[in-house]
């Protein structure tokens, strides 16, 4: 069952990615290994309520809900930021500026949105992404879950 932890009740020392004071964190069971910074989505391969209590690495679809805050193995409980500030969220290397809207991309990443996109906006970039595949950026997540 997903467990809510509103208003960032977890100590910042308990998660590997820094979140802001108003961040909302929910615990889910994961059905595959995840890396801190991966965007995650609801696991629609499950049935009944398990579809909203279990997550997998996000893909370019409308099921993505937040960012994994820790690296975990398949079957573990993972804390996911579903709203607010997150440092080091995975991108596909196309985030060009602070303020870019973010939509789901493949392999647990997000990409810069465009006017023609039909995927949901997940949040906005607070900086240009950095690194070399995988890329990361600080983001603000809009609540969807």
Task: State where each predicted segment sits.
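Surface-exposed, low-hydrophobicity beta-strand/loop segments enriched in small/polar/acidic residues
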Residues: 1-145
């Amino acid at each position: 069952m997903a467990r809510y932890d509103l208003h960032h009740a977890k100590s910042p020392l308990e998660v590997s990615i820094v979140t802001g004071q108003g961040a909302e964190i929910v615990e889910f069971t994961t059905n595959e290994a995840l890396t801190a910074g991966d965007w995650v989505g609801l696991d629609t391969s499950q049935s009944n309520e398990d579809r909203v209590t279990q997550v997998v690495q996000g893909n370019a679809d409308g099921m993505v809900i937040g960012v994994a805050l820790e690296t975990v193995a398949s079957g573990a409980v993972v804390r996911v930021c579903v709203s607010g500030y997150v440092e080091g969220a995975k991108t596909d290397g196309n985030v060009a500026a602070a303020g870019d809207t973010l939509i789901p991309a493949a392999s647990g990443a997000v990409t810069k949105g465009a006017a023609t996109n039909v995927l949901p906006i997940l949040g906005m970039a607070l900086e240009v992404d950095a690194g070399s595949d995988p890329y990361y950026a600080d983001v603000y997540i809009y609540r969807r879950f």
